[in-house]
Amino acid sequence: MAKPSRGRRSPSVSGSSSRSSSRSRSGSSPSRSISRSRSRSRSLSSSSSPSRSVSSGSRSPPRRGKSPAGPARRGRSPPPPPSKGASSPSKKAVQESLVLHVDSLSRNVNEAHLKEIFGNFGEVIHVEIAMDRAVNLPRGHGYVEFKARADAEKAQLYMDGAQIDGKVVKATFTLPPRQKVSSPPKPVSAAPKRDAPKSDNAAADAEKDGGPRRPRETSPQRKTGLSPRRRSPLPRRGLSPRRRSPDSPHRRRPGSPIRRRGDTPPRRRPASPSRGRSPSSPPPRRYRSPPRGSPRRIRGSPVRRRSPLPLRRRSPPPRRLRSPPRRSPIRRRSRSPIRRPGRSRSSSISPRKGRGPAGRRGRSSSYSSSPSPRRIPRKISRSRSPKRPLRGKRSSSNSSSSSSPPPPPPPRKT
């Protein structure tokens, strides 16, 4: 008893939880016997007051929790009856309905008249004519309720298509109008409650839908911003940036998304890479110009078609390593027709030496438009010292032309 009494005393003083309060009630009797007189009064007062307050607090929230559930259930319960009522008329109209709907009545017909007429078929419990309250005149239809289903069926058979006050009347089974009148206010009262949460939910859903959609819309933009950065080096390798950079102002205005992707990174990056690569960029151009010059040589002379093939096979690794800036080939292609006649003019020089280097030099020098072959070799010989020996070597091995520069470059190759 000592252990439980201690556990009960401490909660009675603290009154922290509802369980402790309930224990303080049950444990108040043993605590009296064990505790002193002063502690009794304190424990009793403390235990009684917090226990009541805590218990009331603990009991009240579940009641509150139940109370909202009650109205929610009440709000939910009324709508099913209208659905049942909607489905029931079809069933009752065939089987159980005791009310006849009499339509197309004249304004002279009263409820008493209907009761007399339909009373011939059986006991009539209730008769009602729909009134237009604004004008206080009958709307032209009424309801007659019979006590027995058989009587209602007889009345429906005889009175459907009969004449009352010179008008042909339609009689059909329906539900009494009172249920119709009384039922709509319930669903109407319940409907706003439902509609309000639905509208709130719809608004919340719309907001939720709007929220994720906006980030989704923004996410593709972010992706596009990132994707061009990732894709930009590839187009640079594929010669796109230089074609786009001169044409970019014209292409940016129409605003095709693909071109924007290609153009936006050059706007951001070209400043830094152009500054950083400007000194280093010319050598890669020089290295790359000859490989594209070689196919044109091949076109010119079939004998040289065989020689460049080994060059292409062996040279691709350095080209791939230096591939990212392929900007010069555009200029090479645009100026290539001018340089071809230059080759024909330089035929007086040994054809292998004059034509080969002229094509290489003219194409590699992206800034010289159509210079004489003599000027080109001077500029290119300085810039292309590293790669000429490679081709010179191969050309000398394939073709009997030997040039002085080839022997030193092989160490540069390695």
Swiss-Prot record:
Protein's name according to its UniProt entry: Serine/arginine-rich splicing factor SR45
Origin species, per record, is Arabidopsis thaliana (Mouse-ear cress)
Question: What are the Pro residues biased-composition ranges?
Answer: 404-414
The record describes its post-translational modification as: Phosphorylated by AFC2. The phosphorylation status regulates intranuclear distribution.
Motif Nuclear localization signal 1: chain residues: 62-69
Q: Per its UniProt entry, which superkingdom is the organism in?
A: Eukaryota
Entry's induction text: Levels of the isoform 2 are altered in response to sucrose depletion (Suc) and temperature changes; reduced in cold but increased in warm temperatures.
Q: Positions of the region Required for isoform 1 function in petal development? A: 218-219
